């Protein structure tokens, strides 16, 4: 999210107001992601979790993305996703962020580090 917040700042500084940057996450959702990319231990743990109420359906996991793509008045300095237990499940809304998530110095350093490591320079 810090990378997205830095992108927001850079777009605002260059007066690009037609672009909106939002951050969302699905929470804990029953998808094939773990089955296709997780190691054996992760797969076993996730399969066990899927037997509990701590994992929601893939459809519910998509709701934060749909909300961010369709709602017009969302705060750009936020994280949207499930707001229930451990922010893994529950109603969709604005999540809780720690104060360091808004650390401008770290955001800028992350942006520059990303440019250095990828060899790409964003012309914003």
What are these language model-derived features?
Residues 1-124:
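NAD(P)H-dependent oxidoreductase Rossmann-fold/reductase module
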